[in-house]
């Protein structure tokens, strides 16, 4: 790791507060020195913040694709009996409903977090914003993972069925339905991976200041 | 938040490195001052680390309970036909198998992480350990959530069935099976909440040093 480079970091407001509290007489020259010297790892932090912003854009694309693909999935089979038509829609299955709601919330959250991510590009040492982002990212990671995993369990069942519980595989009839649902699940797992990366990167950025 | 108290934090090794790099002539008195004064927020950090350790113990209990409850679930109905007996076991359903594996892995990881958590009680400012813990906790949060959510989707189906996919509710027959499976799912969600808390607390602990 780059802890060697980080060891020379100086956080200006903190140094000032610390110096005021402890050694007021030598406070002024220290502050002057730190202000004159550019941050040694500001570039590294800025790179991390820019990557964070780009990852958020990718995650918006992934969650939006997942939510809309799942939310518009609807297949009516071309044959029907006297009493009912065979139709499969995402809102027949509560797990798919939850998936749409969870990925839509994640997508909205990501859009709202973009300005905060932008601020941390220009102020790489603002710890409050980083902390806010890492906490809400953790919650959203859990939400997106829950949506993706529950939908996966149902998609697996739709593909393979389960003989012991007497649940039949419906994908033999509803091929298009199963295909788009599987696509949505894959997109949501991409979003899960991105959320994990976002949390880890925020942790790295919080490490030194 | 306690940012007012944190603003006076001084990290001894970093202050020394920083002082050496920037202003060697006034480095010695500063280090002497900081060494004489105890850490203002060392107690707060230590409390956080102790709470982290206790939460890990609770999470071990929750994941162990979830894994063993699910892993020993097996119900044979008291009636049978000529050809087969009605039996429900967790390993009939892949989602339940995944649940057992995921919670068992989380449980093992938590046991392995205890020594690291202990070290960070005695050395609240060791950032490398915190960073290691937050990154692996994030991965485990995703794993445990995935296991819990996929099992929930199947448990919901077992309780309610799904008319459009023609999947019947099996809980009317397998009442004991469904009860213990539901208990395991609840325990795993407790573990998920604890993992989220662990990640957030590590983020807080990384914030200032």
UniProtKB/Swiss-Prot annotation, chains A, B:
Source species: Vitis vinifera (Grape)
Chain's role: Regulates membrane-cell wall junctions and localized cell wall deposition. Required for establishment of the Casparian strip membrane domain (CSD) and the subsequent formation of Casparian strips, a cell wall modification of the root endodermis that determines an apoplastic barrier between the intraorganismal apoplasm and the extraorganismal apoplasm and prevents lateral diffusion.
Annotated PANTHER family: CASP-LIKE PROTEIN (PTHR36488:SF11), CASP-LIKE PROTEIN 1U1 (PTHR36488)
GO cellular component: Casparian strip; plasma membrane
Lineage, opening ranks: Eukaryota, Viridiplantae, Streptophyta, Embryophyta, Tracheophyta
GO terms under biological process: cell wall modification; cell-cell junction assembly
Membrane topology type: Multi-pass membrane protein
TM ranges: 47-67, 96-116, 138-158, 184-204
Official protein name in the record: Casparian strip membrane protein 1
UniProt keywords, alphabetically: Cell membrane, Cell wall biogenesis/degradation, Membrane, Transmembrane, Transmembrane helix
Cytoplasmic side: 1-46, 117-137, 205-209
Compartment(s) of residence: Cell membrane
Quaternary structure and interacting proteins, as annotated: Homodimer and heterodimers.
Short name of one Pfam family: CASP_dom
Keyword Phosphoprotein among record annotations: no
Chief location: membrane
Ranges of the Extracellular topological domain: 68-95, 159-183
């Amino acid at each position: 790791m780059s802890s060697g480079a980080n060891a020379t970091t100086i956080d200006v407001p903190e140094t000032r507060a610390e110096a005021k509290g402890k050694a007021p007489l030598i406070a002024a020259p220290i502050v002057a020195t730190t202000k004159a010297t550019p941050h040694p790892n500001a570039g590294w932090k800025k790179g991390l913040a820019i990557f964070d912003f780009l990852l958020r854009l990718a995650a918006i694309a992934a969650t939006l694709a997942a939510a809309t693909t799942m939310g518009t999935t609807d297949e009516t089979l071309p044959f029907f009996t006297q009493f009912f038509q065979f139709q499969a829609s995402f809102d027949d299955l509560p797990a798919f409903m939850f998936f749409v709601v969870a990925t839509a919330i994640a997508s909205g959250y990501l859009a709202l977090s973009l300005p905060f991510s932008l601020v941390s590009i220009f102020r790489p040492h603002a710890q409050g914003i980083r902390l806010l982002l890492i906490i809400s990212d953790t919650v959203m990671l859990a939400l997106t993972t829950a949506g993706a995993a529950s939908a996966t369990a149902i998609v697996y069942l739709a593909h393979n069925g389960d003989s012991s519980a007497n649940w039949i595989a419906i994908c033999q009839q509803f091929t298009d339905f199963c295909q788009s649902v599987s696509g949505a699940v894959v997109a949501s797992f991409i979003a899960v991976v991105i959320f994990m990366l976002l949390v880890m990167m925020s942790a790295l950025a919080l490490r030194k200041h």
